């Protein structure tokens, strides 16, 4: 049987967008290596509603 891969898809959600109370959410999908980064990741991504780069955190 084949082994389960280490690379998984994760969803990143904007933290600043939630605080503003505006409609909708800013989410991005990316991949991470489970073996190298077991903790949740934070990346700066572009939020089209706020029109600026914001911190996006991994959600489960």
Curated annotation (Swiss-Prot):
What one GO molecular function would you report for this record? structural constituent of ribosome
What InterPro entries does the record tag this protein with? Ribosomal_bL33, Ribosomal_bL33_sf, Ribosomal_zn-bd
Q: Which SUPFAM superfamilies match?
A: Zn-binding ribosomal proteins (SSF57829)
**Annotated keywords:** Ribonucleoprotein, Ribosomal protein
Which GO biological process categories is it annotated with?
translation
| Entry's Gene Ontology cellular component terms | cytoplasm; ribonucleoprotein complex; ribosome
Which Pfam family would be a valid example here? Ribosomal_L33
Please verify whether the record's keywords include Nucleus. no
Per the record, the similarity remark reads: Belongs to the bacterial ribosomal protein bL33 family.
Record-linked HAMAP family: Ribosomal_bL33
Q: Which NCBIfam families match?
A: PRK00504.1, PRK00595.1, rpmG_bact
Question: Which protein, by its recorded name, is this?
Answer: Large ribosomal subunit protein bL33
């Amino acid at each position: 049987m084949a082994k389960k891969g280490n690379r998984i898809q994760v969803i990143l959600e904007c933290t600043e967008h939630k605080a503003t109370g505006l409609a909708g959410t800013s989410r991005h999908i990316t991949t991470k290596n489970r073996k190298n980064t077991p903790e949740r990741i934070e990346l700066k991504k572009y939020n089209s509603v706020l029109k600026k780069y914001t911190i996006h955190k991994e959600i489960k």
